[in-house]
Every structure is written in C-alpha cells, then in structure tokens.
A protein has these predicted regions:
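Walker A/P-loop NTP-binding motif of AAA+ ATPase domains
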Residues: 1-178, 182
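Amphipathic alpha-helical interface segments
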Residues: 193-197
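Hydrophobic face of alpha-helices
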Residues: 96, 188-191
Length: 244
C-alpha cells in the first residue's frame, strides 16, 4: 500500500540499530536515502536548515516505489527546542522546525509510493516531543542488549569451530553467560581480541599456540562493558513508558 511508516529505533550504542535499517532496505528491495545527523549540521547560519531541506527533498522527489529514509544519530537534529531564538539554540530550533515541516511534506507526498522513515538514537529522551506525536515518529522500538541466545551466537561466530584453536579449559558457554551487559559490538570486539592472542604469542615465541582461559580473563579484564547498569536501567525505564 501507498503509505508512510515512521519508526524510531533507540537503545545503547553498538546494538545493531543501523544494521537493522540496512537489512530492512535490502530485504524489501527499497531505495535507501541514508545520512548521519552530523552530515546535516553545518558551520554557518542557516546551513543546517538548508541541508535538512535538501536531504528530505531528495526523498520526496524520488519516484522509486519503495523508499527507506534513514537518519542516524537522530537526536543531533531533533533535540528539544528551547525558548531562545538566537545563537546555537536558535539555529537548532529552526532545524527542528524544518524537520517537522519536511516530515509532514513527506507524508503528503506518498500517493504513489511507500516510504519507511527510520531514525536511530542513543538518547531518545532528548528528542523534541512534537516529533514523536501524531503521524510522525510515533512508533518507538527499543533495541536492547543481546540476551543469552544472542550472546551465544556472537561468541560462536567469533570463536567457535576449529579456528582459532582452543585449549580444553576454554568454555564458550560460560563466556557467553559472563558477557551479560555487553553490547553486540562489545562482544564482537572481545571475541576478535581473544582470537588474536595465540597469534601475538606466535609472533613473540615462534611456537604455535591456542586460545586459553587465561587469554579470556586477560581480555575481559581490559575491556569492561561500554553500557553501565545505570544507563541500561534508564533505557528500560523509557521503554516501559514510551516504547515496545
């Protein structure tokens, strides 16, 4: 059907929000208009507003039947407006006003096409409420930290199989359990660092080696989670109130 669907994906950094948008575009064979909010923010007065209009006009004028519009780091261009109309605050107020007008124009332009507008943020509580109401981004989806099943998958992907070789004391199931509270990106990085340890030893000694439990302990000690329990709690509280 010819319609506009608008979704806000929120959650901790490194949980795959951007990958979700890319997968959606590929799966549905959609033309993707992708940008980061930092690409919209300009250095000169009025530049950010013009960049926002140019990006949204590209979506509105695209004649493709299925379009996915994607803005990463959305809170940088959609923050709560203030009562100040001068300086940096005034400029950001104008950017948000322009964004609201563009979203409404995008909804009205979809008579012969389907538009899915996806925005991602690590700070959903900082977004101007007007953007999250009515026919705008009123569908909010929490993309949280991986559960045990997802952590098992990530650990097996990074360390399973015969490469890298592992000593008998290595327990990947236990590692997956210990990685509770880590983001998907954190886990992938940790697995890469663990897998590199035998290679580093080989460079030093010239002898073949394998992943040991000591390697795992060393890497975990040097790489704490990037998401604190307090921050995760804030996301969960927001999700109970606003999302699903």
């Amino acid at each position: 059907p010819n319609r506009t669907i608008q979704i806000l994906l929120y959650g901790p950094p490194g949980t795959g929000k951007t990958m979700f948008a890319e997968a959606l575009a590929n799966e549905l064979n959609m033309t993707m208009h992708r940008c980061k909010a930092s690409e919209i923010i300009g250095s000169y007065l009025g530049e950010s507003t013009r960049n926002m209009r140019a990006y949204m006009d590209g979506i509105i004028n695209d004649e493709s039947p299925r379009i996915l519009a994607f803005i990463d780091e959305f809170d940088a261009v959609a923050g709560m407006r203030t009562g100040h109309n001068s300086g940096a605050d005034g400029e950001m107020n104008r950017v948000v006003n322009e964004l609201l007008q563009c979203i409404d124009a995008m909804v009205q332009s979809n008579k012969d096409k389907c538009i899915v507008f996806v925005a991602t943020t690590n700070r959903p509580w900082s977004i101007d409420p007007a953007i999250l109401r009515g026919k705008r981004l009123d569908t909010q989806i929490y993309v949280g930290l991986p559960d045990l099943e997802a952590r098992r998958f990530l650990v097996q992907k990074g360390l399973g199989g015969s490469v890298p070789p592992k000593s008998p004391d290595v327990d990947l199931e236990q590692l997956a359990k210990r990685l509770q509270g880590y983001s998907s990106a954190d886990i992938s990085t940790i697995c890469e660092k663990i897998a590199d340890q035998p290679l580093f030893r080989h460079f030093r000694t010239g002898m073949p080696s394998c992943v040991t439990q000591r390697d795992i302990e060393r890497v975990l000690a040097a790489n704490p989670t990037s998401v604190s329990p307090e921050l995760e709690g804030r996301y969960l509280a927001y999700n109970r109130k606003k999302g699903f």
